[in-house]
Amino acid sequence: IDLRNYGQSDIVSAYEDLGLKSYNDVLGAFDYLKHIGFKSNKIGLHGISLGAVPAIFAAYEEPAIKAIWADSTLAEFNMVLKDEIGRYGLSIEFGPVVSFVGQRLSGVDPSDLNPVKKLSNDQSYFFTHGDKDERMFVSHFEYFKSFTKKNNIKASFWLAEDSYHVDAMFKYPEIYADKMQKFFIENLK
């Protein structure tokens, strides 16, 4: 799932839904794959950037999904809000206003955008991130790492050196592919 260019499934009114509804598309694809003969324990998800949000949310809704690879994604809405407000040089006091306006315009509550709270002890995750990511700061990666350790959630991590946002797959394609292959082979049995 890659929502960096957004798709028609994510449009609510004239605004993007931050992946909060598109997890239903992922569940539809999961059901379709089962319908054409794939076993549910052989279907994993790979989400890139914002695309990891619906992948994580879909896995939360469908426990049969056992392996989720999340590349350069966000952990919690409040972290993103703080990052984005800071990026534009605004005071954090603008946060509630930005959140409220976003909810009114899009029809979705951005405070529901908390993938870290959708992680399960019954699934396996792989989080990768670029150490120089300026779009989605490394603090999100570190938060996932801390949260999964604290909550005994099965997760692996790779902080790709000298890499920016969703850059590791291009900068280190062989390593990326090898790690991904091993992760899915190990967790889709």
Where are these regions (language model features)?
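C-terminal catalytic histidine-bearing segment of alpha/beta-hydrolase fold enzymes
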Residues: 142-189
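Short beta-strand/loop motif that positions the catalytic acidic residue
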Residues: 119-122, 126-129, 133
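Hydrolase active-site cap/lid region
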Residues: 57-108, 123
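Glycine-rich nucleophile elbow surrounding the catalytic serine of serine-hydrolase chemistry
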Residues: 47-57
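Conserved alpha/beta-hydrolase
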Residues: 1-11
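Alpha/beta-hydrolase active-site loop
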Residues: 16-37
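Conserved alpha/beta-hydrolase "acid-adjacent" motif
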Residues: 134-140
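Alpha/beta-hydrolase fold nucleophile elbow
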Residues: 37-49
